[in-house]
Amino acid sequence: MIDKLAREELVDMVPYQSARRLFASGDNEQANSRTWLNANEAPGQGQYQLSSENINRYPDFQPQALLKAYSNYCNLPVDNILATRGADEGIELIIRSFCRAYQDSVLICPPTYGMYAISAENHGAGIISVPLVNTPEAQCQLDLEGLKQQVGKAKVVFLCSPGNPTGNTLSSAQIKAAIEIFKDSAMVVVDEAYYEYTNKELGAEQVNIKLISQYDNVIILRTLSKAFALAGLRCGFTLSNKAVITLLSKVIAPYPIAAPVAEIASKVLTNDLDVMQARVISANSLREQLSEWLKQQKWCSDVFDSNANFVLFRCNNIDEKNKVFNLLVEHNILIRDQSKQQQLENCLRISIGSEDEIAQLKQLLETL
């Protein structure tokens, strides 16, 4: 009966395979015994005191303390910010707000984050693909000529910088060029989930943020899941002009941010920016050390430049890729196999965990 009633295109659709979903067992003890280096989570846990006052009441639609805290952090007015359940909800809201089912399309630049296509497919939007290209200057950059050929065919264009799973950063010039290309025909979404790993110091100019006031078709996605080490909260932010925020507010659920989430997130954004920055500095240092180590391994043929909290690398062949992956899994160290992604044959991705976790991983792989 369900197959009769369900939307036909969803019956055989493969859902997004999140890192936890791939290795979920339902056994908390087993989960805690594993080293999770496959979801780009930050290591360590914070301690937070919560108030139980008014827990019997629904939270504000958009908690003002949270919006003000993020406003101070990103130097945008509150009217330009929408708090969401992670950046993933922002992706979904954008597609639902701008794309009519079975009429409009989104554009993606693979290899890229899988939820853009999954969310589009769920909504019945078409998917146009313009793959990233390697240039003499850098890997995985935008194909601007390819993008020009798609003007008028897509309503939403997703750019990821730093990219996931590649880790590369798109230049400001490339991002601005893409915005110019689509300024009269599509919204350009710049996913900056890993932005903090590119920022050298607190208070530094946030270049892409300025584009919001310069163009009507710019949306930026941010999250507290990565550098802020709050993946379990599911708290993200969609940044754009007031008209876009007003539109998305018509589509979002009435109570998207739980009161405890807003309370913790507000405290972290107000009091713990220095803690976040120290975490970023540590992760970046470990990333560079791991990248250099990988380059010395006989089974590794390429290490991608990264400005995020992970390293993507390519093995010589599928057999060696499987040996690396399976050896780690056998010892409860989980990394991400990206080899099914376009252009990423035999590629694996390692999240930057703690210093001890990375040392354990290297020690194990040195036995190959």
Curated annotation (Swiss-Prot):
On whether Transferase is a keyword of this UniProt record, the answer is yes
Which family, according to the similarity comment? Belongs to the class-II pyridoxal-phosphate-dependent aminotransferase family. Histidinol-phosphate aminotransferase subfamily.
Q: Which residues carry this modification: N6-(pyridoxal phosphate)lysine?
A: 226
| Biological processes, Gene Ontology terms | L-histidine biosynthetic process
Protein name, entry field: Histidinol-phosphate aminotransferase
- Which Gene3D superfamilies does the record associate with it? Aspartate Aminotransferase, domain 1, Type I PLP-dependent aspartate aminotransferase-like (Major domain)
EC category: transferase
Which PROSITE patterns does the record associate with it? AA_TRANSFER_CLASS_2
Assembly notes: Homodimer.
Needed cofactors, names only, are: pyridoxal 5'-phosphate
**Which reaction is recorded as catalysed by this protein?**
L-histidinol phosphate + 2-oxoglutarate = 3-(imidazol-4-yl)-2-oxopropyl phosphate + L-glutamate
Enzyme Commission number:
2.6.1.9
Family annotation (NCBIfam families): hisC
What pathway does this protein act in? Amino-acid biosynthesis; L-histidine biosynthesis; L-histidine from 5-phospho-alpha-D-ribose 1-diphosphate: step 7/9
Name the InterPro entries on file. Aminotrans_II_pyridoxalP_BS, Aminotransferase_I/II_large, HisP_aminotrans, PyrdxlP-dep_Trfase, PyrdxlP-dep_Trfase_major, PyrdxlP-dep_Trfase_small
The protein's GO terms of the molecular function aspect are: histidinol-phosphate transaminase activity; pyridoxal phosphate binding
**Keywords per UniProt:** Amino-acid biosynthesis, Aminotransferase, Histidine biosynthesis, Pyridoxal phosphate, Transferase
Organism in which the protein naturally occurs: Colwellia psychrerythraea (strain 34H / ATCC BAA-681) (Vibrio psychroerythus)
Kindly list the residue ranges recorded as spanning the membrane: none
Task: Tell me the lineage of the source organism.
Answer: Bacteria, Pseudomonadati, Pseudomonadota, Gammaproteobacteria, Alteromonadales
HAMAP family membership? HisC_aminotrans_2
